[in-house]
A protein has these predicted regions:
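Extended boundary segments
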Residues: 1-15
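Catalytic core of Fe(II)/2-oxoglutarate
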Residues: 26-94
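Short, basic/aromatic beta-hairpin or loop at an interaction surface
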Residues: 16-28
Length: 94
């Protein structure tokens, strides 16, 4: 989702329950003003990098709402999507 179309009120903080602990996660509230982007023709050598969270509140994007869905136009024998998720913390001087 285009971060410029995502308001603070669109993000809902919820508990993320594990067997041994409880964490937190943001869920996205529906808003007809959201501008979603879809990349149906990606090749195996292409990637998308998402900024999932930033503590700064200076006008830069703080997060990117993202999702997956079953594409009804996919051929029945299409290979399933493969994803790699990494969580990286970057510290830098301004």
């Amino acid at each position: 989702c285009d971060a410029q179309s995502l308001g603070e009120d669109d993000m809902i903080l919820m508990d993320l329950k594990y067997k041994d602990r409880v964490g937190e996660i943001h869920r996205t509230r529906y808003n007809p003003d959201h501008r979603w982007v879809y990349f149906p023709q990606m090749t195996p050598d292409e990637v998308i990098l998402l900024k999932c969270y930033d503590t700064e509140r200076d006008g830069r994007a703080r997060w990117t709402a993202h999702t997956a869905f079953d594409d009804p136009t996919s051929p029945p024998n299409a290979s399933p999507r493969q994803s790699i998720e990494t969580r990286t913390i970057a510290f830098y001087d301004d």
